[in-house]
Structure formats: C-alpha cells, structure tokens
C-alpha cells in the first residue's frame, strides 16, 4: 500500500515573487482551475509575502488579496484555498477579509525562534473554523532539538500542521531529514516541508523530509518562487510517485497547467543564478534576492559580497533595510543626513 503525501501548491503566493506580484485575478483563476483539475487539494493564494503585504516595502500587487482569493475560489470545484499570514505584516482584519472571500485554510508564518508570535493568529483562526498550517521560517538557523521545541509551541496553540521551512534554500537533505525527525518526536500535529531550490536540492530535501515523517509538501508550478524558487510541483508529483508515494495528484494535467498556463506568464526562466546560489549558501532569506541585486548595481559592489556579509550578520526576514547599509559600507560610502533647506 502506497504511503500518502499531500502536495500543497504555492504558485499563486510564493510564485508571485517571480512575477513582481503581478498575476491578475484572471491569471489566478486560470492557474487555480488547472491545479484543481489535477487534484491538488490546497492552493495558496495571496501577495508573495502574504496578506497585507502589497506596499512600497514589498511591492504593490496587481490586485487586492480578497480579489485574488475570490478569483481562485470561483475557479475551483474541490480544492481548498489558503492564504499566508505573517504577524507584523498582516492583521486579523485582513485575515477576516480573506475568510469572507472564501479561504478555508490559513498558513501562519513566524521566524523559527519566535513561535510565540503565532499564538494569537493561530488561536483566532481555529476559533473561526479555519484549518491552520504554521511555518517555522528560516528553519536552518536552529538545530533540530531547539526547532522541535518551537514547533511544540505551535502544536500547543492548535496548529493542524507545522512546517519546517527552508526560507533561504540553505538546507541539504540531511538537514531537512534531521529537523523533520526531531519534530516528529515532539508534536502530534502533522508536519510539512517547504523547500527553496538555491542549492539545487529542493526535490531531494522534500523526499527526505517525507521519509522522516513529513506528510505535507509544498511546491510551485515551474518552480516559481522567491530567489531560486520552490520545489517544482509537477516534478514533486512525478518524483514522489516514482518513490512509491500516493500524492492523489494527476501528473499530466499538472504538467499541462505548468506548460501552457504558467510558462507563458513567466518573465524569465526560474534558475539558480549566482545571486540565488550565494543567497542559499550564505543562509539569507529569499526576499533579499531582488533588493540585493539592485543594491549591487547602485553601489558597484558584487551581490555575492553583500549576501555573504548579510549572512555573517545573521539577518532575517524583515531586515531588508540592512542591504543598503552593507552595500554602502562595502563600497566605502556612508549616508549623511541632508542639511535642512536654506542651511
């Protein structure tokens, strides 16, 4: 009897980062419809950084989160629509708007050392009838046992699934397996794994995570996602089937959606370029990818030098302002406060 694995697709959330958050509601509907026909049970939809993130800081989306959610909900027959909630970016009011638009699942994402930041949204979401998946972002930054202790907190708040999240694409299979195995000993909730492909091992990490107890695996069509992108949904489906797992997903409709719906919308192929590779090697959060490239060009400093220094400083998501500081320092420049007018 085949072992069961649940594939969650994040093309319409993490994949938004690959198109500067410019999928239209019609694009969302077309992609969601294809995923639903292929049997994908949960489809994540929102701005690339999550609910409430459309801003000058993270980039303005082509539509509102409720518009995206409604487009997906109206397009599917069976799949649940999910949204990402990051405390400090999203608000409960915005989560309520997403509920009103039709989400059935919320994914609450916290830094791997800050599980307590997820207590309020997790408990609120459970009270409002949602399935709750939780993310321990930048999971490579904690050893397995401390990570499991953080996971236990999320489990105690009522999370249905706790994810090991390789936000930087910094893990190799051993790292993924050890962390999932530690969680399996510490919590009763299901375990998920979210890969990024910066070191080229996203699929291998996902397979190893499953072998060690993960039952939910994230992917995105054509690998769309921040920096090097995510584990590729259609490849995940094929690889898991070859490895003897039951995904419940129909491979060829999935491939068709990737090939004929998603690929024409891509600005460029999703590849592991120099910046993406060094970002994973340095263990830097994936959202630093584009801002680092811009800073490198502005200050005439190699992007890899900026990323290696950011990695040495241990920056995390939300500290993107450090990119300019580091680039300026490396270029031998400093910013001065402009003198008041007329002085």
From Swiss-Prot:
Any idea which positions bind substrate? Answer: 13-14, 167, 194, 285
Q: Tell me where the signal peptide lies.
A: none
Ranges of residues in domain Pyruvate carboxyltransferase: 5-255
Report the EC number(s), separated by commas if there are several: 4.1.3.39
Q: Which residues bind Mn(2+) per the record?
A: 14, 194, 196
Site residues (Transition state stabilizer), renumbered to this chain? 13
Membership in a protein family: Belongs to the 4-hydroxy-2-oxovalerate aldolase family.
Name of protein: 4-hydroxy-2-oxovalerate aldolase 2
Q: Which organism is it from?
A: Rhodococcus jostii (strain RHA1)
């Amino acid at each position: 009897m085949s072992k069961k694995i649940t594939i969650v697709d994040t093309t319409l959330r993490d994949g938004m980062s690959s198109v500067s958050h410019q999928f239209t509601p019609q694009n969302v509907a077309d992609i969601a419809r294809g995923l639903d026909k292929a049997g994908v049970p949960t489809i994540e939809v929102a701005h690339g950084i999550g609910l409430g993130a459309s801003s000058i800081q993270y980039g303005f989306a082509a539509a509102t989160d409720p518009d995206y959610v409604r487009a997906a909900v109206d397009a599917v027959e069976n799949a649940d629509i999910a949204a990402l909630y990051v405390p400090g970016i999203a608000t409960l009011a915005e989560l309520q708007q997403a509920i009103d638009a039709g989400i059935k699942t919320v994914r609450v994402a916290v830094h791997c050392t800050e599980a307590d930041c997820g207590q309020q949204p997790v408990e609120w979401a459970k009270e409002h009838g949602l399935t709750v998946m939780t993310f321990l972002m930048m999971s490579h930054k904690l050893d397995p046992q401390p990570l499991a202790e953080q996971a236990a907190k999320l489990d105690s708040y009522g999370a249905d699934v706790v994810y090991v999240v390789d936000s930087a694409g910094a893990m190799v299979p051993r790292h993924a397996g050890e962390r999932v195995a530690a969680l399996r000993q510490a919590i009763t909730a299901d375990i998920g794994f979210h890969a990024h492909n910066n070191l080229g091992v996203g699929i291998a990490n996902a397979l190893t995570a499953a072998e060690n107890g993960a039952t939910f695996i994230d992917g995105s069509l054509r690998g769309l996602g921040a920096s090097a992108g995510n584990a590729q949904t259609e490849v995940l489906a094929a690889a898991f089937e070859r490895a003897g797992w039951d995904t419940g997903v129909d491979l060829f409709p999935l491939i068709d959606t990737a090939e004929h719906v998603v690929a024409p919308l891509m600005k460029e192929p999703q590849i592991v370029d120099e910046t993406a590779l060094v970002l994973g090697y340095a263990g830097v959060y994936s959202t630093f990818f584009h801002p680092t490239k811009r800073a490198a060009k502005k200050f005439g400093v190699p992007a890899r030098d900026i990323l290696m220094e950011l990695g040495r400083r241990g920056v995390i998501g939300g500290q993107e302002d450090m990119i300019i500081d580091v680039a300026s320092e490396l270029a031998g420049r400093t910013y001065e406060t402009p003198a008041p007018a007329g002085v």
